Amino acid sequence: DLLNSKSILSDPMKDANITGFYLAYHNQNDIKLSKKIAQVYLEKCPSLAFEAKKHTIPQKGFGKYRVGFLSHHFYDHTIGKLYRGFIEHLDRKLFEVILFRTSKRKDALAITIEENADQVVHLRTNLKSAQLAVSSKKLDLLFYPDIGMDSFTYFLAFSRLAPVQVTSWGHPNSTGIPNIDYFVSSRDLEVDTGDSHYSETLVRLKNPPTYYYRPEIPEGSKAPQDFGLPSDAHVYLCPQTLFKLHPNFDSILGKILENDPQGHLLLISGRYKSEENLLLDRFKKVFPKAINRVTFLP
């Protein structure tokens, strides 16, 4: 209906601000929907398809490759943790690393990531301004770790700002965006028919495209009884956002508890109590005898 209407989006950030983020969590091939969403935005807001032609021709010569990393989440966030080491350890004999940030958040991890880049550019959350700022760096490759998690970087990704534009599984779904060329994943994360799930060319690496540092363990580690569990409890922690737990996963959790009578499942509390109640209702249908061994942590 939107494609057939005569409506125009003068500013998709204000007029729509939808990225299709939640599609990744219903266990279906979303390629048609992702491409349709992108098509609607391009039809209704043609300026999204900005192309900096004079800066998107591969640079000739024998200098370093100029690689840009662009995300809202380069701070103490999952994305910051996944890509901190990746940015730090790229061979500087081959690559010049330019970091593009859309968040003003400054914490210890944000400072570390910035220190590991050769240049840092703080982008205004204005599409035209950001398009010009990124394209002016004459990149050889632009890497978006997490298209779809933040609406501004999602809409910016519609532009052609570098000869090669890449995303990865910071958000585990195809963008459907024509100007994103490659989706970098891992062999162990993709099914045999995975290519058909992406509008991008799927690249299967041997290992995930991250460099993850071991988390620092805080002092004063807690014992099971600190969480109201028996002292001999076997603790299974699943610290994932509750809406990401697909019903197909319920039986796996149930089997773990059924096969380990001392097992206790710890989950992170949701933003709303109703999320926990809905999840418990699901669990009761799948593993009712072990439901009393499920605990939500505040």
Features from the language model and the residues they span:
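Short acidic (Asp/Glu) and glycine-rich catalytic loops that position anionic groups and cofactors
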Residues: 13-18, 232, 257-263
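Conserved strand-to-helix beginnings and helix N-cap segments that scaffold or border functional pockets
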Residues: 80-81, 110, 247-250, 276-277
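Short, intrinsically disordered, charge-balanced linker/junction segments flanking boundaries
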Residues: 1, 294-298
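Short beta-strand segments
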Residues: 69-71, 98-101, 143-146, 237-240, ...
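A conserved nucleotide-sugar
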Residues: 94-96, 254-292
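Short, contiguous acidic/charged loop-to-helix segments that flank catalytic cores in large enzymes
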Residues: 74-77, 122-123, 240-245, 267-274, ...
